[in-house]
Amino acid sequence: MAWLADYWWIILIILIGMLINGIKELRNVDHTRFLLNKPKLPPHRDNNDKWDNEEDDWPKKKP
């Protein structure tokens, strides 16, 4: 771990460079074009649909 104490500044420069490159790439993302050409989601599959029509076992609420 002595090398970490000697070369901590190199690791810091690499991390700052990665952060700056990430910010640059995020600025290049065109969110409006993505929203206009957004892929359709498949329909939601309801796994409980066969039980929805049956009566519930819960007691009825009294008015």
UniProtKB/Swiss-Prot annotation:
Methyltransferase is among the record's keywords: no
Segments crossing the lipid bilayer: 3-23
Ranges where the record places region Disordered: 39-63
Keywords per UniProt: Cell membrane, Membrane, Transmembrane, Transmembrane helix
Organism domain of life: Bacteria
Gene Ontology cellular component terms for the protein in this record: plasma membrane
Subcellular location: Cell membrane
Pfam family, one: UPF0370
Membrane topology, record value: Single-pass membrane protein
Major subcellular location class: membrane
Claim: Magnesium is one of the keywords in the record: no
Family to which the UniProt record says this protein belongs: Belongs to the UPF0370 family.
Listed name of the protein: UPF0370 protein ECA1289
